[in-house]
Amino acid sequence: MADRHTLEELNNCSRDELITIVLMMQGQLDTLNENIERLIEQVRIANSYRFGKHTETLDSIDGQLSFFDEAENCCNLSVPEPAAEEVLPSRRNHKKKGQRETDLKDFPEEILPPYQVSTEELDTFYGAGNWRRMKDETYKRLRHEPESWTVEIHTVEVYVGTGGDHQDEFLRGKRPKDLLRGSIVTPSLLASILNVKYVNSSALHRVEQEFQRNGVNISRQTMSNWIIRCAEKYFAPFVDRMKQELLSLPVTQSDETPTQVIGDSDRPNSKCYMWVHCSGEFYKERPVVIYEYQKGRDHEKPLEFYRNYKGVLVTDSLEQYHLLDKKLPGVTNANCWAHARRAFADAVKAADKKNPLSVKTSVAYQALQKIAEFYRIDTELKELPATDRLTQRQTRIKPLVEDFFAWAKQQAAECTVPPKSRTGQGLNFVIHQENYLKVFLTDGDIPIDNSASERAIRTFCIGKKNWMFHNTAKGAGASALVYSISETAKLNNLRPYYYFRYILTELPKYCDEKGNIDPEKLDQLMPWAEELPEECRKPRRS
């Protein structure tokens, strides 16, 4: 708080003292104005996230700016008048004939009784005998029947010896192994529960209510117990085998999101984390997603996961990942350009839209334009082989990246924007992350951003909005295992319900007397295995 001077004190001040007071007040006023601008920016950004579109694309931002001066922004006298052919609507493209037949060909068909016209009605309408039958008209409709329930009654033949060496000894028919001993759960029932909760992001209490509406009384506690027991017994070794596949790849990606676990928190509302690790975006042969629940967010968690890994890890700017780069000789950390541009996008969203010209000449907007050019070129290269993509990146993108960092350093050195503003924070971020942001230029298999892992974790983020929290660490760990399988199945074009049903049917057969599973036998059950039945695979539209 500045000292307040009375009129009498100011009248008694010398010229030099008055100059000192004025300069001091100007400095304080500049600081206040800077703080006010920063607070206004924060409010606008918060409102944008709350009420605006959650997009950072430059096209969307341009559209928002041009809304206020559409005529001036759209005016271009050099554009020629359009021809009549360009103005008049073209003939509508009709739907491909036979597509409905193709879509319905794999479903069972039921021929219904024909809709007949009686002879009496025909004679009345046409006159007696003045008619003949034509070819029948047929059409198809798709019928859906709600889920059905069947109680399976298994019969095991039992014999007893009445003489000889095995007198009074019992012999029973060989029965299949139960999924869970003594439980009524079957692979199809548990697969249905897993599909609703983890694939369709519904809470177990809603599953319980739907079951009750169908006359089936299975509590959510029972369903939760089934999930945890099967996860520990079957899914844990299954996901371990998937993890081996992931860590054999040269490029992986990682991200994390907070979650609440009631029974594993030190204090109310404390955050635990669900980490996701996935194969690189350009690896299409055997894509893998691994979820991992951890109580904290320190670097020890990813350090343990990637301890024996040798390759490139694409992440956001979290310092924990940078420590992996320093502590693990085999790991190279690459940063995400989508995160690098976020602060600039926020700054443009928070700018005064009533003055589009000043926005488009701002440092933040220029930064977005430069980064958008990287993306535009890299998008053109997505379908190329890795070697060709690398060559094109070195030739076309690398000079632009070098120019961007030189420009960013110049803007920071000239203090063209307040350091604490979103633009200033963005400049500081990219300058300090320069080495990590350039890694994608060294290998054609490294993606420009970490969007693949963010897509992989999206299903979990949608789900936690519905079920809010986990009760125990065991439940969170079981969820991580199930999400790993379901998300990997989707990436491999499988139908999660049928895939869960199949592996839950097969996995009990792989258990020895102690309940252990040989990892090598799991290869034929992996989401990319050729041995999977056709019903597990997602049908392709021709």
PLM regions: where:
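Short, flexible loop/hinge motifs at secondary-structure junctions
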Residues: 1-181, 224, 253-254, 393-396, ...
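Catalytic center-proximal scaffold of phosphoryl-transfer enzymes
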Residues: 2-3, 8-9, 101, 158-542
